[in-house]
């Protein structure tokens, strides 16, 4: 039987080494490494984008925006300090609050026009027409005299102050009839109606009937009357 040639030992060792290395790489579990690497890459991308956005805003802030400039103060010929509007003419016409506003005035404002503003005339109720005299009448007609309203007390006549039931009337001070009377004497003061006691000050004229009616309205009964 012929003898089979034997391979040298060097070649046999060279073939067994790659097989052992391949078996070692296959045994290492690399499955969980892929999700971990994807998570780290996503986190890195998030930080890079956030840094870029913050840096862009930080460098843009020192540069003023021409469309959002601060309003300028202008002195008008009338001695008024005005805020110059920043919007266009069309925007000011559409926005009522975008018009110029006076801040300081060196003089008094102009008196209002007799007719008022356009909005006031449009919203005002129609005026009541006053009757005009006929052209045939030749007698001059004078307007009725209206007594001037005064805030001070004055003696009123019976026509001006009609007596009303349930109301309280106040007695005002009257001048002394005689100049020679001394101040504080009983004759210098007006006496109450139906009483001998002088009227020393402003006191209401209240009758028992008015007091009883008041308590009846309040749902109570008067005691001692």
UniProtKB/Swiss-Prot annotation:
Q: What keywords would UniProt list here?
A: Membrane, Phosphoprotein, Transmembrane, Transmembrane helix
**Residue positions where Phosphoserine is found in the record:** 195
Question: In which domain of life is the source organism classified?
Answer: Eukaryota
Q: How does it sit in the membrane?
A: Single-pass membrane protein
Q: Which Pfam families match?
A: DUF4689 (PF15755)
What GO CC annotations are associated with the protein? membrane
Modification type Phosphothreonine: residues? 113, 117
Establish whether keyword S-adenosyl-L-methionine is in the entry: no
Cysteine pairings via disulfide bonds: none
Spans annotated as Disordered: 107-149
TM ranges: 34-54
Query: Which named protein is this?
Result: Transmembrane protein C16orf54 homolog
Source taxonomy: Eukaryota, Metazoa, Chordata, Craniata, Vertebrata
């Amino acid at each position: 039987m012929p003898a089979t040639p034997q391979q040298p030992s060097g070649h046999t060792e060279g073939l067994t080494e790659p097989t052992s290395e391949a078996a070692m790489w296959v045994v290492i579990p690399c499955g969980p490494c892929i999700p971990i690497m994807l998570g780290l890459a996503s986190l890195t991308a998030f930080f890079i984008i956030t840094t870029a956005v913050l840096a862009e805003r930080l460098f843009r802030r020192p540069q003023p925006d021409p469309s959002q400039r601060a309003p300028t103060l202008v002195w008008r010929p009338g001695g008024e300090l005005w805020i110059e509007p920043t919007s266009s003419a069309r925007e000011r016409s559409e926005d009522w609050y975008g018009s110029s506003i006076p801040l300081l005035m060196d003089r008094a404002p102009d008196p209002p026009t007799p007719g008022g503003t356009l909005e006031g005339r449009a919203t005002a109720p129609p005026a009541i027409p006053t009757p005009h005299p006929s052209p045939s009448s030749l007698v001059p007609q004078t307007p009725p005299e209206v007594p001037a309203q005064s805030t001070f007390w004055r003696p009123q006549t019976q026509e001006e102050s009609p007596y009303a039931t349930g109301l309280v009337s106040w007695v005002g001070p009257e001048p002394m009839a005689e100049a020679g009377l001394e101040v504080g004497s009983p004759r210098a003061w007006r006496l109450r109606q139906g009483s001998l006691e002088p009227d020393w000050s402003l006191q209401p004229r209240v009758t028992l009937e008015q007091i009883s009616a008041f308590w009846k309205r309040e749902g109570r009964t008067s005691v001692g009357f």
